[in-house]
């Protein structure tokens, strides 16, 4: 975000080492926490990609294609994920390093010098002899289990149990307290996010979120 020029006047308190009575700082670049920082960064990286020959997607502005170098790219926040040949990826690496300070997380591929496992947005992606495997961010499941006080050793064999409406009317269920209701919504939302990568829990989570 710090590479994106500020689009409006934003004033901040000076740090202690630069403090001066009656003075403040005016941002020249965007700063985390300001309302338009994410938008300003989007404008910045789109200009960078387009100026280097990429075409922006129509259905999703976060998807890019470079026709000349046959590169596909997806941008999420400040994470860039690309698909292309070694030559094309080397070109992009030099191009973006000339513009920004970047951290290269890895290059997944079949060749001897390629990485066989990389972490992308806290998902683990591995290249194996059988194909590419994709593991969801396990932290979300661990947080849900911990907050519910569930023993992970006691697993269920099916995603849910159908309730007989004749045996269950809901009258014997006590409403959740305010704090419990907030916790339920938070955990259901977290599980809903996790279910995008965990098809085995998708149905159960959908049912949990229906009347949230």
Q: Each predicted region: which residue ranges?
A:
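Long, low-complexity, charge-biased intrinsically disordered regions
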Residues: 1-212
